[in-house]
Amino acid sequence: FVKSRGGYLTSPWHGMETGVYVVPTDGKSIPRKVADDGSAPQFANDNDVIYLTRTKYTGEVDWSTSLFRVKLDRSEDVAIAKGDFVSAFSVSRDGKWLAFNERFHAYVMPMPLVGKTLTVGAKADALPVKQLDVNAGDYLHWSGDSQKIHFSLGDELFTTALTNTFGFVAGAPKELPK
C-alpha cells in the first residue's frame, strides 16, 4: 500500500513516514517500508519484488511516468519502463507482458527484462505494441493466467486475449481479428 501526505481535502496529520509499504496478510506483523516514493504498487511473478510507478512532471502539462522494479529487501530499485504521457502501467502476473495507458488509450507489449529501461508508447518501435481499444480504455488488469487483459470504458468491461493480439503467441490464429 502507499502512505501519502494529506492535501486539498485530507489532513496531513497522519502523513509521516510516507512511502510504499508491504504487510503480511496474517494480520500479526507490522507494515514494512520498501520504497520512499511511488504509486500503484503491484506484484507479478516474484513475490520478493513489487513494481511501482513514479511520475516526473517536466512542465505544466508534460510528464513522464516510469515503472520501477523494487526488491522487498530494498537491495534493488531499477527503472524497467518509461513513457511520456503514460498514466498507468499493469504488469502481467507471469511478468512477461506490460499493459499501459497513454493519452486515454490502452496498449500491451512484451516486457523482457533486458537490463535497460524500455521506452513505451503508441509509436515505440523496439518491441511490438498493440492498441487494445477503439475509443479509449482505462483500469487495466490481467487474468490470473496472464493470457487476457481486461479494461473498461465507462460502464463497459472489455477483455482481449493475447492470442488475438500478437501472431507470435502460442495458439494465435493465422489471421488476427481487427
Residue ranges of each PLM-predicted region?
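Residue-level recognition of a conserved intra-blade site in WD40 beta-propeller repeats
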Residues: 43-44, 91, 142
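Juxtamembrane proline-rich low-complexity "stalk" or linker regions positioned immediately after a signal peptide
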Residues: 136-138
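Tryptophan-centered short beta-strand motifs
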Residues: 31, 77, 126-129
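Short amphipathic beta-strand segments in non-cytosolic proteins
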Residues: 71-73, 124-125
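A short helix->beta-strand "capping" segment at the edge of beta-propeller domains
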Residues: 123-133, 178
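A flexible loop/linker signature enriched in serine peptidases of the S9 family
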Residues: 1-21, 25, 33-40, 48, ...
